[in-house]
Amino acid sequence: YKRQVYSVVSEDVTSRKYTVSIEGVQNIMRYSLDEWSEFDAGSSYDNYWTPEPAGFLATSNGGAKMLNGSSSAVKVGYPVMKETEGFNGGAAKLVTLDSRGHALGSLAPITSGSLFTGVFSLNMLAPLKSTKFGIAYDKEPKLFKGVYKYKAGTNYIDGSKKPVEEGLDVVDECSIAAVLYEAKDASGKDVTLTGVDINTSEYRVAEARLKDGTDKEAWTAFELTFEYFPDKVYDSTKEYKLAIVCSSSKEGDKFKGAANSTLIVDELEVVGE
């Protein structure tokens, strides 16, 4: 297979080389999660780690920085970090944090760890719109593969309720999925799905989703087939985006999950043709 090396200049103008494999006719989108860089969050916030390549992979750390002011008495910590003991090299460790002790905890009682293809752009008025899922994808996706470990936390919190409820008789689960969606609407305008509509949008075409989000103590491999939504087919004349989305709490977007639920993912890969 052909192995191409791209030089990418990041925002701090350090040139890094990334290796992208293109194997035969089958196009493989692969993230080894070995390379991470420290993101400068500015003088008011603690820095955090972000996976490479930037612009392709993002995390929920960008939102959690508001809970980690450098002079703040209460710091919640960051929900996504590099796991050095990955399945192969580094991996991504996603943790659901109880953020109720922070002044902003009323807005976000829990902060789940999420890793996704796309970009994070903080929207304080509509937090779910901060996660802009998906990157351009020009193949028909067939399989979504990877390895993971998961351990649900013990104190399940429902932050969607006022007042917040905790200690609920619910066992948390992780969420791992890949979604193919149309990149343009009928008038040719760009479509980008966010935390608001990634699970409901009419632009979704196919999805590969892990059915079993329960605890897995040992590294567990998954190989998921893309299933098409009703009345949807792949059309090679259309433009598409592909969103890989992993979360330490499957309902974290609704501020529901267990404190300390931990998902570790590695070697994520989408095979298309």
What are the language-model segments listed below?
Residues 2-28:
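Beta-rich interaction/scaffold domains
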Residues 148-167:
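Short amphipathic, basic-aromatic surface patches that mediate peripheral association
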Residues 141-144, 148-149:
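Extended, hydrophobic/aromatic-rich amphipathic alpha-helical segments that build helical scaffolds
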Residues 155, 252-255:
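A generic structural signal for short coil/turn motifs at secondary-structure boundaries
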Residues 23-141, 169-223, 228-229, 234-248, ...:
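Aromatic (Trp/Tyr/Phe) and Gly/Pro-enriched flexible surface segments
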Residues 9-12, 154, 168-172:
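Ser/Thr/Pro-rich, low-complexity mucin-like regions
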